[in-house]
């Protein structure tokens, strides 16, 4: 393994109250090397420069601790995980988590399975599938303490994909840019319909950077109606908005 300067990431994580062991640091470095290697064969990320990956992928993923700190034995699902952000990074930092990494592209699942094996991680699985299908009863529905997502979608759409996975009393956390705060008002109807309630929207800057981020935290207060999520494509084409209206009726008829 090549030698890397770890001072910056260690300082960044200290700002979040996270201290990594030598083993965890080694896992993150190996994760980085695998990401770059596999990215040469398939498009996993546009960000491959070492310091950028540390800041924009690893540190950003672990910023979850700004709003909550998962405990040992908690079950977490990452919807639309891509190359494993934030879910795999959270698993490394919090090894007691039980993590499911969900993505619709099989090539990403191949990378994730290779990374899980190489990093020697337990209680983590990569699942090839769509949120609309995996949220069916008897699979992942309402079986998780936390659902996280950095997927690029509006908050109403993400809520429909993610809230069905969260058990009552659990949390859905959406990783958004500084523009995420503007989506919150439009998404509150969707949150309510899906059994959620906005807990907080936290804006911050990643340590030693000008990168503005927003974590939107939604608490699951009641079960999601069985008709959600709707069939593939509808949550993004016709997101739940405003009052019970034309868009929602069209999508569920």
Please give the residue ranges for each predicted region.
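Class I SAM-dependent transferase core
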Residues: 1-77, 107-110, 114-124
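Residue-level signal for inorganic ion chemistry
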Residues: 35, 90, 176, 218
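Short loop/edge segments at beta-strand edges and connector loops
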Residues: 48, 128-130, 200-202
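Conserved SAM/SAH cofactor-binding pocket of Class I
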Residues: 62-153, 159-160
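Helix-to-beta-strand junctions that scaffold the AdoMet/dcAdoMet cofactor pocket
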Residues: 94, 166-168
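Short alpha-helix immediately C-terminal to the canonical SAM-binding loop
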Residues: 108-110, 180, 184
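Conserved beta-strand signature within the Rossmann-like core of class I S-adenosyl-L-methionine
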Residues: 169-182
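SAM/dcSAM-binding transferase cores
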Residues: 185-253
């Amino acid at each position: 393994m090549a030698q890397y300067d770890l001072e910056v990431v260690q300082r960044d994580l200290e700002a979040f109250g996270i201290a990594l062991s030598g083993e965890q640091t080694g896992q993150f470095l190996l994760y980085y090397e695998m990401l770059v290697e596999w990215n040469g064969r398939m498009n996993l990320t546009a960000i491959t420069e070492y310091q950028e990956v540390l800041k924009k992928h690893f540190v950003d993923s672990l910023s979850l601790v700004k709003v909550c700190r998962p405990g040992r034995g908690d079950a977490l699902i990452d919807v639309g995980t891509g190359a494993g952000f934030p879910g795999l990074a959270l698993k490394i930092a919090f090894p007691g988590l039980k993590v499911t990494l969900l993505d619709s592209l099989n090539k990403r699942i191949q990378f994730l399975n290779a990374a899980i094996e190489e990093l020697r991680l337990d209680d983590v699985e990569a699942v090839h599938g769509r949120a609309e299908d995996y949220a069916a009863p008897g699979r992942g529905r309402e079986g998780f303490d936390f659902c996280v997502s950095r997927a690029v979608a509006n908050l109403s759409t993400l809520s429909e994909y993610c809230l069905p996975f969260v058990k009552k009393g659990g949390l859905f956390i959406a990783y958004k840019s500084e523009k995420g705060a503007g989506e919150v008002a439009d998404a509150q109807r969707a949150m309510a319909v899906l059994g959620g309630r906005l807990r907080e929207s936290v804006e911050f800057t990643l340590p030693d950077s000008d990168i503005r981020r927003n974590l939107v935290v939604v608490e699951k207060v009641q079960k999601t109606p069985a008709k959600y999520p709707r069939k593939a494509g509808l949550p993004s084409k016709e997101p739940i908005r405003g009052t019970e209206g034309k868009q929602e009726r069209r999508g569920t008829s």
